[in-house]
UniProtKB/Swiss-Prot annotation:
GO terms for cellular component: chloroplast; DNA-directed RNA polymerase complex; mitochondrion. DNA-dependent RNA polymerase catalyzes the transcription of DNA into RNA using the four ribonucleoside triphosphates as substrates. It comes from Lotus japonicus (Lotus corniculatus var. japonicus). InterPro entries: DNA-dir_RNA_pol_insert, DNA-dir_RNA_pol_RpoA/D/Rpb3, DNA-dir_RpoA, RBP11-like, RNAP_asu_C, RNApol_insert_sf. It is found in: Plastid, Chloroplast. The lineage of its organism: Eukaryota, Viridiplantae, Streptophyta, Embryophyta, Tracheophyta. This is DNA-directed RNA polymerase subunit alpha. Pfam families: RNA_pol_A_bac (PF01000), RNA_pol_A_CTD (PF03118), RNA_pol_L (PF01193). Its main location: plastid. Belongs to the RNA polymerase alpha chain family. The gene is rpoA. Residues 266-333 are annotated as: Alpha C-terminal domain (alpha-CTD). Keywords: Chloroplast, DNA-directed RNA polymerase, Nucleotidyltransferase, Plastid, Transcription, Transferase. Residues 1-233 are annotated as: Alpha N-terminal domain (alpha-NTD).
């Protein structure tokens, strides 16, 4: 573990890694500071970085498995200790590292008896396993276990409603997010007559990249979002020229209603793409929502106060905490 005493500049804006450690092959931690910032800037940057880290980072994982020995997801295979469903869940947990794009094929071909682990996966050259010891199955008899795998790189979650196909392949719910969690906090102080802030940013990753690499990538992604505004400034459009003149049509009540419906539809699509991982939820509330199959902000917004109270282990203060968050989120444009 590396930890540094925090010393901040009073003039030049700079960032620094003040703590880093490797808790396991699949859990890296880093703590960073950015200072000095003017009042309000730390929260602006912290919220944006956290959303990018949890929602926009790309990762690689197994998204489909196929085997002739599998009749259905909840079946068992003679000579294998785990049921098929558990094997698929173990494959879902395998952490991969790559820069591939598109779909790649991989496979497992194991002769029992013995333990099948991540190191038994035959991968394309562009893909690396982060933890070779991850358990997949226990083959208890001298049989051949062959599984075809599909690997993809994407972002966020992919919850598959269609689980199995006629060719004997099974979709696996994919968690592409390489960042397990991200938090930010703010320390305010007075420098002379000026109020300033220090932003503390904590990042946990799954080992496919370090927290420092995640910070770099998230920063690039955030910068890319603002580049179009810079280009618009550089173009310096001449609106005095006739070719740039636009005649605005008159709106009717029907047009206004249609526009309102379209805006509502766009908002629903936006909420559908925001996962509850991107909300600042306590671990207990987050876990209860996931167990209730609530994965997105849209799914959360459709729940009433009474629906939330029916969730197992939920208390009144938990529901109030969620309602406070929803009150903020639903006003986003």
């Amino acid at each position: 573990m590396v930890r540094e005493k925090v010393r901040v500049s009073t003039r030049t804006l700079q960032w620094k890694c003040v703590e880093s450690r490797i808790d396991s092959k699949r859990l890296y931690y880093g703590r960073f500071i950015l200072s000095p910032l003017m009042k309000g800037q730390a929260d602006t940057i912290g919220i944006a970085m956290r959303r990018i880290l949890l929602g926009e980072m790309e990762g690689t994982c197994i998204t489909r498995a196929k085997s002739e020995k599998i009749s259905h997801e909840y079946s068992t295979i003679v000579g294998i200790q785990e049921p098929v469903h558990e094997i698929l869940m173990n494959l879902k947990e395998i952490v991969l590292k790559s820069n591939l794009y598109g779909i790649r094929d991989a496979s497992i071909c194991f002769k029992g008896p013995g333990y099948v682990t991540a190191q038994n996966i035959i991968l394309p050259p562009s893909v690396v396993i982060v933890d070779n010891t991850q358990h997949i199955a226990n083959v208890t008899e001298p049989i051949q276990l062959c599984i075809g795998l599909q690997i993809e790189r994407d972002r966020g979650y992919r919850i598959n409603t269609l689980k199995n196909f006629q060719d004997g392949s099974y979709n696996i719910d994919a968690i592409f997010m390489p960042v397990r969690n991200a938090n930010h906090s703010i320390h305010s102080y007075v420098n002379g007559n000026e109020k300033q802030e220090i932003l503390f940013l904590e990042i946990w990753t799954n080992g496919s990249l370090t927290p420092k690499e995640a910070l770099y990538e998230a920063s690039r992604n955030l910068i890319d979002l603002f580049i179009p505004f810079l280009h618009a400034e550089e173009e310096k459009l001449n609106f005095e020229n006739n070719e740039h003149k636009v005649t605005l049509p008159l709106f009717t009540c029907h047009d206004l209603l249609a526009k309102t419906k379209l805006k509502k539809k766009k908002k629903e699509i936006a909420f559908k793409s925001i996962f509850i991982d991107q909300l600042e939820l306590p671990p207990k509330i987050y876990n209860c929502l996931k167990k209730s199959n609530i994965h997105t902000l849209l799914e959360l917004l459709t729940k009433s106060k009474e629906d939330l109270m029916k969730i197992e282990h939920f208390r009144v203060e938990d529901v109030k905490h969620i309602l406070d968050i929803l009150e903020i989120e639903k006003h986003f444009p």
